[in-house]
Regions:
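Hydrophobic, small-residue-rich alpha-helical packing segments that form membrane-like cores
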Residues: 456-460
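Bacterial Sec-dependent N-terminal signal peptides
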Residues: 1-21
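Surface-exposed interfaces of beta-sheet-rich extracellular modules
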Residues: 676-690
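Accessory carbohydrate-recognition regions in carbohydrate-active enzymes
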Residues: 19-347, 351-387, 394-455, 468-489, ...
Length: 715
């Protein structure tokens, strides 16, 4: 009988092995954490003392668009706090984006004598692991195995100490990635400590330990100060566990979040639930074919696309608004998107899979705009909330007040003022923004990035015009559509580049299309990187050149003229002068489509996907910053053969997928399929639901019908 049961168990195991592999198992949260060092990857020989920017992503535990990102800190004042090549860990912080901010409440378990300025622990990547919703590392200095998992608003720490040692916890309350204005940590109950950190607003925490708290002391030396939590009964051998709730409202709400999400669950349960949440999200896109490497990059980049924006409201709906008031408006409140980056692709991908989150993000930015002078929030550069709102509405995400959002966006586009578009008065007066005339190499933010602003404002005006049309505002629609042609005002036909002008209207004389300006004429780009940006009007853009042959020659030169060895902030990963390590170039390859050379575009797209997402010695580096998921979403969409060439428009340019079959389930549970026929780079035919598509675009409404998109290729 025993042999029978053993045989039966083997059968069940065998059956289990034939089931589909979990998609979370393809995800490597460490992908993107390494930095590029070699000249062939960077595009130049490094001379700066500081390391170049990597993808600036974190490997720790989080849920999709959560409040908590619980992740190791290897260096403060770095992009995401974690760099793969670093050798020590300072703590595990609870918020993260990857933009040199956040990293709230870093904590580290410890034992023995502890120095306030020298407490970081060494670690080895051989004893480090990560998967969606879970992170583990062995802290060599203290002999402690650290494990982390999380819910939306709570972090769970499990620390396994050496047997018989005294357990302590370092809380580095004076550190985040920003300046800490104020902080507090105190014992609340026998097993509870609470507090806050104040950087650009307060984040509160409520922490529950499975060991009684004996004392909380401040330890300082001439360099630094830390808080040290001592635990009673701490020589017992059970792991030290901490369940920590967070809130941007109050300690009371942090406790409420903890009680709702985590307090009655153990570590294994929380980690399993996190894995399940990610599995459900990743399962929206299932792929067949491709290599194991391609699937690994695909699901890792899909995972990475859903970590930002971050939740800022509590389980009861409370949040702290732009005026510092605690309010409850009946929606989940989120941080602003990283608009200069992710409007291009990631925010569309977010809406395709999580339209409910998109709806609440738009409600959030509208609430902020109404309370900050009547302007819709912008981010860093450009005014791309217009693209996000228009593209979301036209794709059927209509659960927000479009008129309220439009009122803000129209003010952004037409009324100069603090909080609106920089240099809008110039743009409205002339149709372009003037730049200073100089013969000196400019640096950083002394200049206007006038070319980039002008061409981007033109596209933003187009997006706002689409909303005006939806609302029947014909007068402003016509005005904004006229403004959408302003990109032409800075096109220099004598050079074939967008080029800066001075106040008089003359072209800037000292013009070098190869030089990578940081903020002079172009934003983090040179003239080559800035070519062909008119996603709303590619035919009009192309018509600025003498003929299609001239456009083809310009494109060919872009991808073959070698980068001239300049060291530039945020510019790495080159094909000729095309830079994939930063966003401005990301739509350029598709220009080939509009001159009848789609196959040339595909050669470039395949090269980008093949080269720039697992670079470096460890195969863990991106070509450049992920910028809150934009770089990742670029890969996801191109890998399935649908790209958001003009994200304001509800359509996708079709390319050759990496995979033979893609099954995509939208957020409304409609499923469409993408099939690739042949292995060539030239698209011979595109069919949807059996009908041939004339042109290169498939609409969102077509995809919502849940049919087959068949892409037939030829060599």
């Amino acid at each position: 009988m025993k042999q029978f049961y053993t045989l039966l168990l083997m059968v069940f195991v065998s059956i289990g092995c034939t089931t589909d592999k979990q998609l979370t198992s393809y995800v490597n949260p460490l992908l993107g954490t390494a930095t590029l060092w070699e000249p062939e990857d960077l595009g130049y020989v490094r001379t700066w003392k500081n390391r170049t920017w990597g993808a600036e992503v974190f490997p720790g535990a989080s849920l999709p668009n959560a409040m908590v990102q619980l992740s190791p800190v290897t260096q403060f004042r770095s992009g995401a706090g974690y760099q793969y090549e670093d050798t020590v860990i300072y703590g595990f912080a609870h918020t993260n984006k990857g933009h040199w901010n956040l990293l709230h409440l870093p904590m580290l378990p410890a034992t023995g004598e502890i120095s306030a300025s020298d407490y970081a622990s060494g670690y080895s990547h051989l004893n480090e692991s990560a998967r969606p919703g879970y992170y583990q590392v062995f802290l060599e200095k203290y002999g402690i195995n650290a494990e982390l998992t999380s819910t939306l608003r709570c972090g769970y720490h499990r620390y396994t100490f050496p047997k018989g040692v005294e357990k302590k916890l370092i809380a580095d309350m004076t550190r985040t990635n920003n300046r800490v204005k104020d902080w507090n940590i105190q014992q609340e109950e026998e097993y509870v400590f609470t507090g806050f950190q104040d950087t650009d607003g307060k984040i509160y925490f409520y922490a529950v330990s499975n060991y009684p708290i004996k004392d909380i002391r401040q330890v300082k030396d001439d360099k630094h100060e830390i808080s040290l939590v001592y635990f009673g009964e701490s020589r017992k051998n059970e792991p030290l566990e901490l369940k920590i709730g967070f809130s941007f409202v109050s300690v009371k709400n942090a406790k409420m979040n903890l009680d709702k999400e985590m307090i009655h669950k153990d570590f294994t349960q929380v980690a399993k639930e996190a894995d399940k949440t990610w599995e459900e999200l990743l399962s929206h896109i299932k792929v067949t074919g491709g290599t194991t490497r391609e699937k690994g990059i695909f699901y890792s980049t899909l995972y990475r696309s859903f970590l930002w924006p971050a939740l800022r409201s509590d389980v009861n709906g409370d949040f702290t608004d732009e005026r510092g008031n605690v309010v409850n408006e009946g929606f989940r409140y989120y941080t602003n998107p990283s608009f200069w980056d992710d409007y291009r692709n990631k925010l569309v991908l977010l809406g395709m899979i999580s339209p409910d989150v998109t709806t609440d993000i738009i409600k959030s930015i509208t609430d902020k705009g109404e309370k900050r002078g009547g302007y819709m929030p912008t981010f860093f550069h450009g005014d791309h909330a217009s693209v996000f709102v228009a593209g979301s509405w036209l794709r059927g995400i209509t659960g927000f007040d479009l008129e309220r959002a439009y009122k803000l966006l129209l003010k952004n586009a037409t009324v100069p003022g603090q909080g609106g578009r920089p240099y809008l008065d110039e743009y409205l007066k002339r149709g372009w923004i003037a730049e200073k005339d100089t013969t000196h190499v400019p640096t950083w933010d002394e200049y206007k990035a006038a070319v980039t602003k002008t061409v981007e404002y033109a596209y933003d005006d187009y997006a706002t015009a689409l909303i005006a049309k939806e609302l029947g505002d014909q007068e402003n629609h016509d005005l904004l559509m006229r403004h959408s042609g302003n990109y032409k005002n800075l096109f220099d036909p004598s050079t074939g580049f967008f080029r800066g002008k001075i106040e008089t209207g003359s072209w800037i004389a000292d013009f070098d299309p190869y030089y990578p300006y940081f903020a002079y004429m172009y934003r983090e780009a040179n003239a080559w990187n800035s070519l062909f940006f008119a996603p709303h009007d590619p035919e009009g853009m192309i018509a600025l050149y003498p003929d299609h042959k001239a456009v083809e020659q310009k494109l060919d030169s872009l991808f073959t003229e070698p980068w001239r060895g300049y060291e530039a902030h945020n510019m790495t990963g080159f094909i000729g002068n095309y830079c994939h390590g930063n966003q401005p170039s990301h739509s350029i390859p598709y220009t080939y489509y509009f001159i009848g050379k789609q196959e040339k575009a595909q050669c470039v797209l395949d090269s980008i996907m093949g080269r720039f997402y697992d670079m470096g010695e460890e195969k863990l580096a991106y070509a450049g910053m992920d910028d809150a998921g934009e770089m990742s979403a670029w890969y996801v969409l191109n890998a399935i053969g649908l790209y958001t060439y003009s994200p304001a428009d509800p359509e996708y340019i079709v390319s050759v997928p990496l995979f033979d079959k893609v099954t995509f389930t939208l957020g409304d549970n409609t499923t469409f399929t993408i099939l690739k026929e042949g292995n060539g780079k030239k698209i011979r035919q595109i069919r949807y639901d059996g009908d041939v598509i004339n042109g290169w675009f498939v609409t969102h409404d077509q995809l919502k019908k849940g049919r087959e998109l068949v892409i037939t290729t030829a060599e």
